[in-house]
Structure formats: structure tokens, C-alpha cells
Amino acid sequence: MNMYIVVCVYTLPPAYIKKWFKLHLNNTKYKLIIVDNNLRRQITDPTVIIGTNTLNEFSAYNEGLQLLKKEFEDEYDIILMLNDTLFTRHNAKFFLKHLLKYKNTVARLSIPAIGGRIDPYNNICYRNPWSNDIGYISSFCIIMNKPARDLYLKLLSDISPTFPFVDSVTELFNWSTHIDRRFKEFVISHLIDTDTATVWYQSKNNIKNIERLNVKGKCVFLEHYVSGNISKHGVLVSIFPTWKQKTQHFIYEQIAKMERKLLSILNFKVGSK
């Protein structure tokens, strides 16, 4: 099975991504497309796309998929898309191990299908406005088939720069009247309610940065909009469908978090000597 991988990078250098996949997917046939959204970085590697970073990973995914559709249309069976938070905030090895177990399932389906971690709606809005699902696929790492790719690109192209809100995302009256009110409140709360457990982890540092909040708000909207519409016209495939797997995932995420914290402490001690 041929697999194409589209990776959006912010903090990690493209060389790290190439090395990681070469090490961990050495028995898998794949082609890697890296979109670098770090606009401060000087890119000399001709195999790396310089991203626009207009919509974080969503603009990078769109740019990578457009290249894929244009130049490699018939050369792949499955697409893996991810951003580098998979490596900086998650347990990449454990996650991809489970994700790729479903690559044959997703590729085989004739309807639009995406696979990944399904997160539940757990505050304010409890169902997806487009599919009525009680969960959604988290966009940091997914696999998709060709029908899903085509629908994914269409969904992104159908969204205008002034939709679903204009000016400030945090003001309810700036939102389109076509969007479910509970979902609007869900997005706003995720961006500004800094004392809650469901707030965006970068909210406190960006609470007065309206431009940053607007971009993040649109990306949150797109995550649920894309997941809901693909589910409406196809299927979502959960890579952790049982409680046992959900528990394993939680444990391995905590292990990775502790490893990163320990490494940070060790690096600080070495650097301070």
C-alpha cells in the first residue's frame, strides 16, 4: 500500500521529521510532503514547501493536499496528515502505531473516511452541528482516503475569509447567524475562559491578541466543520474504540509528558553549568 504523508511543522525542523519517519516507518512505502509554517525560518531544502500559515495546520494541509492532487494523483492509497504537535505534545510512536492499524480499513472504504482520535463534546455544545455526532476527529493527526481528500478540499474552498465570523471571534454578534448558537459559545469559551479545563492551552498568552484568537477560532471551527461534514457524507474511524485502548492512550500520553518534562529539567541543568 502506498501512503503519502503531509506534515505541517512549526517548531521542529523538517530534518527531524524526515529522520523520525525514516526510523519508525522503515518497513512502510511512503512519500513525505513537509509544509513549513515557521515564517521566521530560512528554508533551503527544495523538498520542503514554504507554508503561508494563514490558518495554521489547515492552510498547510490544504497546500500539501493540493500538491498531492496535482502531481501524484494516482500514486497513493492512503493519506496521513499531521502537525508537529504530535511530537511535541503527544506520544507520537504510540499514536501512529494505532492509527496505522486502520489504514487498510480507511483505504478500503468507498465513501469519504477519516481516522484518528475521536474526542467527545464535553462542555456547552454536546453534539456536532453538522453531523449530530457526540464526538469529532482531532485534527493534529489523521488518515484519510481519496474520497475524503476530495471532500476535505471542497470544504476548505467553500469557506470564505469572512465566514463564520468577522472582526473579533470573541464577540457573539460577529458570528454568522447560520452557525448553531451553542457551537459559537463553545468556540468562544475555548478561547477566552482561561480558568476552565477546556480552554486552549495558549489562551492566557494570547488573550489580548485578537488576530491570534481569530486564526485559532477559525481553526477550531474548521476542525469541527470538517469532521462533521465528512461524517455526514461518509464515516469517522476511531483508532481507540474500546475503553482499554482509551486507557492505554491516556497512560502513554502521560508517560510522554513526563519524559518531556524530565528532558527539559536535564537540559536546563546542563545549560546552567
Kindly give the residue locations of the regions a language model identified.
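ER/Golgi luminal nucleotide-sugar-dependent glycosyltransferases, focusing on the catalytic module
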Residues: 1-273
